[in-house]
Regions:
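Pore- and pathway-forming membrane helices of multi-pass small-molecule/ion transporters and channels
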Residues: 50-65, 105-135
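Alpha-helical transmembrane segments and their membrane-interface boundaries
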Residues: 1-81, 85, 89, 94-102, ...
Length: 189
């Protein structure tokens, strides 16, 4: 048992992913810069807290991995919303102790998977809520407003590229229904 476990730890002989072309790296980096500028400028010019620590990782996912299921708009916005809501419920209504934070994180991760809105950067939101001692307003600003803004920048910017197309889907339930209808209709014809 111990040997097989230790064998797993050494990894597999998978190659390191290739580096993107310099042109692509510049395109990605400029998109990330624009998204950070939008939320940064609005935060500083309006004095509203639109910036959230997990948004840096969200911006990475949206611009470096736009085809990933984790980068799709519903995953980004709803992932942030649900995990922040869970963090607030536990912080405000259960306890501000460490164990409450751990339970909030576990439930937030489970809900993202159940609801099919997994967005890894949003997993840090319960921790952020507890560390800041956030109140209920944190759910709307920065969580909802900020996540919508970075998705809007990603929608605009990623589609400027001739080789990128974002998003891949808005609602996976629609895609599943569409595929089922196509296969059912195809079988009838």
């Amino acid at each position: 048992m111990t040997v097989s476990y230790l064998t797993k730890l050494k990894g597999s002989p998978a190659p390191i992913p290739s580096r993107p072309a310099l042109k692509e790296i510049c395109f990605i980096s400029f998109g990330a810069f624009l998204a950070a500028c939008v939320i940064g400028y609005l935060a500083y010019s309006t004095s509203y807290p639109i910036i959230m620590g997990s948004f840096g990782a969200s911006i990475f996912v949206l611009f470096v991995l736009p085809e990933s299921p984790f980068a799709q708009p519903r995953n980004v916005v709803l992932g942030h919303f649900v995990t922040t809501l869970v963090g607030l419920i536990f912080f405000q209504l259960v306890s501000s102790d460490w164990w409450s934070m751990a339970i909030a994180l576990a439930i937030a991760i489970a809900l993202m998977q159940i609801l099919r809105i997994s967005h890894p950067p949003a997993g840090s939101n319960p921790f952020i809520v507890f560390l800041l001692g956030a109140n209920w307003d944190y759910l709307w600003m920065p969580t909802l407003i900020g996540s919508v803004l970075i998705v809007l920048v990603a929608l605009f910017y990623n589609n400027i590229s001739e080789v990128r197309s974002y998003p891949k889907y808005w609602n996976p339930y629609y895609i599943t229904l569409q595929a089922w209808l196509n296969s059912s209709l195809g079988a009838l014809l």
